[in-house]
Regions:
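Short, small-residue alpha-helix embedded
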Residues: 15, 135-136, 194-218
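N-terminal basic/disordered segments at the start of proteins
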Residues: 7-23
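Short pre-catalytic strand/loop immediately N-terminal to key active-site residues, enriched for Gly-Thr
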Residues: 1-6, 184-198
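Conserved N-terminal subdomain of the carbohydrate kinase-like
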Residues: 19-102, 106
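Conserved phosphate/ATP/ADP-binding segment of small-molecule kinases
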Residues: 110-184
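Nucleotide and nucleotide-moiety/phosphate-recognizing core
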Residues: 79-87, 175, 183, 220
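Charged C-terminal helix
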Residues: 45, 219-259
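Phosphate-handling active-site elements
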Residues: 22-26, 185, 211-225
Length: 259
């Protein structure tokens, strides 16, 4: 994943989410991103050689139960990650196809879209596109539940074992649709009027990966992850001048009696 010096998205959100779920977080940085709650100012991709070295450093030393993949902005990054996934064969691979930041800044180069489809999607146990990302992947407008179902099936046909199309961007009750390769599952949610939505996609995909690593089945893993993000938004502290982060440790703070 990419970095976030403001701590709300990318590798920072991933690590917080894994830790909140009782997992030990490891991270491989794919891009150094200058961003905060107000937007992305710029980024620099890490070289494929250094990405490969980071992955080797992790897998050669520590047993990995699940992998979550976030920002992979150029074809070279995607290819080296795919090669390493084939080499190490982790049990679960969750891919969040990060294309556009909450602020609207594009994080996936246009020339990388086809590489993402051809090289990374077939290695994904779960893919978690939001509506704009699902539209890019399928080339079709999504305006209804039926469109979400069609998109999930179409993306699964590209190779992903399961696809969770997130409806929070447009669907009235924030319902998400999961296609597991055979059946559809629906996850209704309450829409919260909040600006604390920075890193929600990162946090959801990492929560799914955490839950799978902890032994949950896919349907339960998605439901628990959705609840985790909802509670994180509902109890978020007002941080920053723009779209602030969710409260990743709300449940732990509550148990510890921290206000």
């Amino acid at each position: 994943a990419g970095t976030d010096p403001s701590g709300g998205a990318g590798a920072a959100a991933d690590c917080k989410t894994f830790c909140a779920h009782g997992c030990f977080a490891l991270n491989v940085i794919t891009a150094v991103v200058s961003q905060n709650t107000q937007g992305v100012r710029g980024y620099m991709d890490v070289t494929p050689e250094l990405i490969a070295s980071q992955i080797d450093a992790v897998f050669e030393d520590i047993d990995v139960d699940a992998v979550k993949i976030g920002m992979v902005s150029v074809p070279e990054t995607i290819r080296v990650i795919a090669d390493k996934l084939k080499q190490y064969r982790p049990a679960f691979v969750v891919v969040d196809p990060v294309m556009v930041a909450t602020s609207g800044h594009r994080l996936l180069a246009p020339e990388a879209e086809q590489t993402l489809k051809d090289v990374l999607l077939p290695l994904a146990d779960v893919l978690t596109p939001n509506l704009p990302e699902a539209e890019v992947l399928t080339g079709k407008k999504i305006e209804s539940f039926e469109d979400m179902e069609d998109a999930a099936k179409a993306i699964a046909a590209m190779g992903a074992k399961a696809v969770l199309v997130k409806g929070g961007h447009r669907i009235a009750d924030a319902t998400d649709v999961l296609f597991d390769g055979k059946d559809f599952h629906y996850y209704k949610g309450k829409r919260i009027e909040s600006t604390s939505t920075h890193g929600t996609g990162c946090s959801l995909s990492s929560a799914i990966a955490s839950n799978l690593a902890n032994g949950m089945n896919l349907s339960d893993a998605v439901q628990a992850a959705k609840t985790y993000v909802f509670e994180g938004i509902a109890h978020a502290e007002p941080i920053g001048k723009g779209h602030g982060p969710i409260h990743h440790f709300y449940e732990l703070y509550k148990k510890a009696g921290v206000q």
